[in-house]
Amino acid sequence: LLEDSGKSVNDFRNEIYKKFNIEEEKLTPVIENYAPEPTQPYLVEKEDKPSQIDVSPKLSEMKEEFIGERLLSGFSPKSTRELESTIDDLIEIIGNIPILKVTPNNARDFKKIISSLPKYRNQSPRYRGLTIKQILSLDGVEGQEPKNINKLIYRVRVFFKWLKNNYSEYVPQNHFDGLSIQEKKFDKPRDIFTNKELHKIFDTTPFLNNTIRNPHRRNKLASYFVPIIAIHTGMRLEEICQLRLEDVYKEGTVDIIRVTISKETKLKTVTSQRIVPIHENLKRVGFLEYCNYMKKQKKERVFWDLTKSRDGYGRNIGRYFMEYLRKVGVYEFQSKVFHSLRHTFITTLLQNGVREEVVNGLCGHKQKTMSTTIYFKGGFPPDLLYEEGISKLNFEGINFGKLKIDWKKLIG
């Protein structure tokens, strides 16, 4: 119709407004909106959310927590210090980064760099006080053997195992697993002393000249008694040197040494706690008389004059004994050392027909059979350990009684 009339929509609208007296007004078109009225927004300030890497703790923070927990758990201060030192090396090599940021590349870098460092760099005047970067820039730096490299990798692996167990949201896997270097196996002779070597070690004149008669020897009584105790008890160097007088006593009819953990004494493992009956040879050289005298003097430790170093009480005695082995022509690098006395004790008992579980009980080794573990939780009784173990220990042709001294003259 609009097309036939020749008029526009506005023409028709104006005619209608005029005919019905409708006041012309401007109408604003409305678009229907069924959405609800907007409410006043909350006043929330937009913030940049930190990444998970940024909020994960740094290596140094975790090191402090890890070391503190180990000390609380009763691990030895020495092994804990070694762990801490190696973790410090890791931080120096890869940086004090968040634990989530540690990558397989970081682990490989640690292995590569630690392999190039000298073994005793902290003890050597040449390297002492230098950073790892400075040491690697020097000429003629010899790297480490696989055995020691693996020991360092193992320490870091222990740290990251702890991180994985305690902070799995940041450390889902241990990048130090499987990094150990394969070591070539050598047919290394057992590190025990032969009977001929024991004769050289405990020959009266050289032994006394190196211990109580040595004018330059400090800790004369300790350097005298400790090796004799070791060969007759199988005790470790530190176990002997830290021994308390209250741990030398009679139980029933048997004189014993109690090897135990206390506030002042540390052991290699919890299973190292044990009792060891005192051999007749120790009585012949006056060890019990010496202990009883020291108890009357109100001393606490058997070898009260030994001072504690970073590694414990046995450092000087171990060094003295190694020097002595060289003098008598017995020392072999990493093979014939003080610890060989313990191995000789064990081997001699086994060769003399002592049951393995009795030997384990005397040495603080974990029992291998389930029945022994269950039924002898408290350990074997002292009389059994003496009759079936210590009484069968003998060293052919060696008269330890000839080593007896007047130790009171040394005390003054």
Regions found by a protein language model. Name each.
Residues N209-H216, T233, K296-R301, S309-R310, ...:
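Short, basic (Lys/Arg/His-rich) helix/loop patches that form interaction surfaces
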Residues L198, D203-P206, S262, H279-F333:
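Active-site/catalytic core of tyrosine-dependent DNA strand-transfer enzymes
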Residues L1-S60, E64-L72:
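N-terminal helical hairpins
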Residues K161-N174, A222, A230-T253, E356-G361:
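Short, charged phosphate-coordinating catalytic segments
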Residues D139-Y154, N174-L237:
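Basic, Lys/Arg- and aromatic-enriched nucleic-acid-binding interface segment
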Residues E280, Q297, K368-T369, F380-G412:
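C-terminal secondary-structure termini that scaffold catalytic or DNA-interacting sites
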Residues V248-T253, S335, V354-F376, G397-L410:
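Short, polar N-cap/turn motifs at the start of nucleic acid-interacting alpha helices
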Residues Q242-V285:
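Conserved tyrosine-mediated DNA breakage-rejoining catalytic core shared by Y-recombinases
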